[in-house]
Amino acid sequence: EVPKSFYTDPLMYQATSAGFLGPRDPVVVPSEDYGIDLEAEVVVVTDDVPMAATPAQASGHIQLIGLINDVSLRGLIPAELAKGFGFLQSKPRSALSPVLATP
């Protein structure tokens, strides 16, 4: 069940931007023991959003909306989170949908 706080304070993170896989590209990792997990997620592309923008102001900066196949390596996540800096090795390239839509 989705925690109630997610409706007012959604879970978000900023990942590295090393590029994306194509929609049909294979997901290649050194070992399946890393715990490969695929997650369908929504991607929102914005232009420059000013710091401290309200949700209403930020919504005016949305340029594109699409789907992304987010790839996680579950076996690496606990150790990374324990370091206090978030995801890096546990988040390889994700696969971007071939189509994005304007809002």
Regions found by a protein language model. Name each.
Residues 1-103:
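Glycine-enriched loop-and-adjacent helix/strand subsegments that border the catalytic/binding cleft
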